[in-house]
UniProtKB/Swiss-Prot annotation:
GO terms for biological process: base-excision repair. CDD domains: EcFpg-like_N (cd08966). A zinc finger (FPG-type) spans 257-293. Pfam families: Fapy_DNA_glyco (PF01149), H2TH (PF06831), zf-FPG_IleRS (PF06827). It comes from Xanthobacter autotrophicus (strain ATCC BAA-1158 / Py2). Its EC number is 3.2.2.23, 4.2.99.18. PANTHER family: FORMAMIDOPYRIMIDINE-DNA GLYCOSYLASE. It catalyses: Hydrolysis of DNA containing ring-opened 7-methylguanine residues, releasing 2,6-diamino-4-hydroxy-5-(N-methyl)formamidopyrimidine; 2'-deoxyribonucleotide-(2'-deoxyribose 5'-phosphate)-2'-deoxyribonucleotide-DNA = a 3'-end 2'-deoxyribonucleotide-(2,3-dehydro-2,3-deoxyribose 5'-phosphate)-DNA + a 5'-end 5'-phospho-2'-deoxyribonucleoside-DNA + H(+). SMART domains: Fapy_DNA_glyco, H2TH. NCBIfam families: fpg, PRK01103.1. This is Formamidopyrimidine-DNA glycosylase. Belongs to the FPG family. One of its GO terms (molecular function) is damaged DNA binding. It comes from the Bacteria.
Length: 293
């Protein structure tokens, strides 16, 4: 499933062509994705201007004129492709030539400038919703989400307080979207390695008895932020389905230290151990038992 860096990469790729553009027409090539598309979907989008493109956790938010927001979730295998058109009179870096549509191109937006924005989703776990602007943060998909890990509200003090009473594993705590929004399996594994913390460690041990941050909490916040920023800069990680909107692969997977490296040597200088894989709450966890305590 695309995590925060992949969704943020898509958001940044959409801005040059979709933000400020008018949707001339929309095609819904099937009535549903994970859930049914909104009633009168094509009619409700035709003629609307996209005022801004934001992100909350793993959700893309397209503000429409008229006081509504289109929520788009990529699900397990969704991707967005831009074809044709030009930005400011010349081809944009996120454009590529228009090609034949595929069987999994389920929604197509035709923009007034000639470009098309296509949502492709082979497994159909994605979703597109249209919600009134003043109800967006109370919508069930977004209500209750924790702070953004790259935002000012996420720091060592917050993380320590949030974990202080948790007796689950540290990895399970970080995957809880109510604690911090947008983190997934890949980047939690990588951040824990950088912070030198075992995924088996109990979450409350990064805080003092009073809920104050320890050095562990401080290291972990820095590691999470660094991993996410580097992944965004690299265009995300392409393991199965993720593509940037110009069709290119992300390449952060080439810098993985632990994820999907079971049995391979740890890359830490002087460490002679190998990367191990365990299963936690039904998900594979990769870590170095020597470097992570």
């Amino acid at each position: 499933m695309p995590e925060l860096p992949e969704v943020e990469t898509v958001r940044r790729g959409l801005i040059p062509v979709l933000q400020g553009a008018v949707i001339e027409s929309a095609e819904a090539r099937r009535p549903d994705l994970r859930w049914p598309l909104p009633d009168n979907f094509a009619e409700r989008l035709a003629g609307r201007r996209v005022e801004a493109i934001g992100r909350r956790a793993k959700y893309l938010l397209a503000d429409l004129d008229g006081g509504e927001v289109m929520i788009l979730h990529l699900g397990m295998s969704g991707s967005i492709r831009i074809e044709g058109g030009a930005v400011k009179g010349r081809p944009g870096r996120f454009h590529h030539p228009r090609g034949a549509g595929g069987p999994h191109d389920h929604v197509v937006l035709h923009l007034a400038g000639g470009a098309t924005v296509t949502f492709n989703d082979p497994r159909r776990f994605g979703a597109i919703l249209i919600v009134p602007y003043d109800q967006i943060m109370s919508h069930p998909l977004l209500a209750g989400l924790g702070p953004e890990p790259l935002g000012n509200g996420f720091n060592a003090e917050y993380l320590a307080r949030a974990c202080a009473r948790r007796h689950t594993s540290l990895k399970a705590a970080l995957l809880d979207q109510k604690l911090v929004a947008g983190l997934g399996n890949i980047y939690v594994c990588e951040a824990l390695f950088r912070a030198g913390l075992s995924p088996r460690r109990l979450a409350h041990t990064i805080a003092t008895a009073e809920g104050a941050p320890t050095r562990r909490a401080e290291r972990l916040v820095i590691a999470i932020r660094d991993v996410l920023r580097e992944a965004i800069h690299a265009g995300g990680s392409s393991l199965r389905d993720h593509r940037q909107v110009n069709g290119e692969l992300g390449y952060f997977q080439h810098t993985f230290k632990v994820y999907d490296r079971e049995g391979q040597p740890c890359q830490t200088l002087h460490c002679k151990d190998t990367i191990r894989r365990i299963v936690q709450n039904g998900r594979s966890t990769f870590y170095c038992p020597t470097c992570q305590r």
